[in-house]
């Protein structure tokens, strides 16, 4: 990360993740693994009436995977499933280096991971939580990617 402000955001989410805990009462749960890096998370969501009311994750991994999952949950809690999938699509496009400035603003703190697009070895780390969330909310997305 070139920008120290972005680095600080990532470090804060890695060292003090607000959403890294069990979530009793979650009605959706899925494990995501990145075998190339050893990242292993389980994502928990509580969804009611199509809105993500709460979310959490557990597991271990590198700073990027842990921070990304925490930032993602900050962003998606309180959103409708459709909005969440839109944000995920923006995040994945950002990681590939193809988002506009206004789209980047929609990602809030998750936009701090923009420089990952220049670090191919870290891309899978950054997208693990997002892919896990997509699989949980809309399994058809993952089937289409395979």
Explain the meaning of each model-derived region:
Residues 1-20, 24, 79-146:
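C-terminal binding/interaction regions
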Residues 16-54, 59:
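Structured beta-strand/loop patches that form or line metal/cofactor-binding pockets in enzymes
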Residues 37, 64, 121-122:
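Secondary-structure capping and boundary motifs in well-ordered enzyme cores
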Residues 41, 70, 124:
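Active-site phosphate/pyrophosphate-handling residues
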Residues 46, 67-69, 134-137:
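Ubiquitous "structural anchor" signal
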Residues 60-66:
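Short, thiol/selenol-centered motifs that function as redox-active sites or metal-ligating centers
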Residues 66-67, 86:
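Alpha-helical macromolecular-interaction surfaces
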Residues 68-78:
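Alpha-helical support elements that line or immediately flank enzyme active sites
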């Amino acid at each position: 990360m070139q920008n120290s402000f972005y680095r600080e955001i990532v470090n804060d989410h890695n060292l003090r993740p607000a959403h890294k805990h069990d979530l009793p009462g979650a009605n959706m749960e899925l494990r995501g693994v990145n075998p190339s890096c050893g990242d292993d998370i389980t994502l928990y969501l509580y969804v009611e009436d199509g809105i993500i009311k709460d979310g959490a994750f557990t597991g271990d991994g590198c700073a990027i995977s842990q921070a990304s999952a925490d930032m993602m949950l900050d962003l998606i809690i309180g959103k409708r499933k459709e909005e969440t999938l839109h944000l995920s699509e923006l995040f994945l496009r950002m990681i590939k280096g193809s988002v506009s400035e206004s789209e980047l603003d929609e990602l809030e703190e998750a936009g701090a991971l923009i420089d990952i697009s220049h670090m191919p070895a870290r891309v899978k780390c950054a997208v693990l939580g997002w892919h896990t969330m997509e699989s949980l909310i809309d399994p058809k997305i993952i089937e289409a990617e395979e």
